[in-house]
Amino acid sequence: MLREMCRMEFGKIWDSQELFGYFAWPTAGRLPDGRLIVVCSGFRMRHVCPFGKVTAFYSDDEGKTWSSPAVLSSSILDNRDAGLCVSGGKVLLTTFTVSRAVQRKYMGMW
């Protein structure tokens, strides 16, 4: 059941021209302390690359401004597609990785 709606202006919460500045597949939620959070796969070169890390951005002002990205999970595999569920004062973060075999399949694309 949707209890609360948050309105924001359309726009970017992060913009980087850096080589590893690609952030994608976001999920947004409200933390028990009231802050907004967006989790995603970030610090990537592009959609398909082996360097993704699960990252989070935080906002204390209803989405007007956002923190720099914080790394929540990083492994030697590509950390992808973070999901978020906040319920009953608890936070569940989901993510997955791809195997080295799958990464080898796409070698040379990055």
Describe the role of every protein-language-model region.
Residues M1-W110:
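Asp-box/BNR beta-propeller blade signature and adjacent active/binding-site loops
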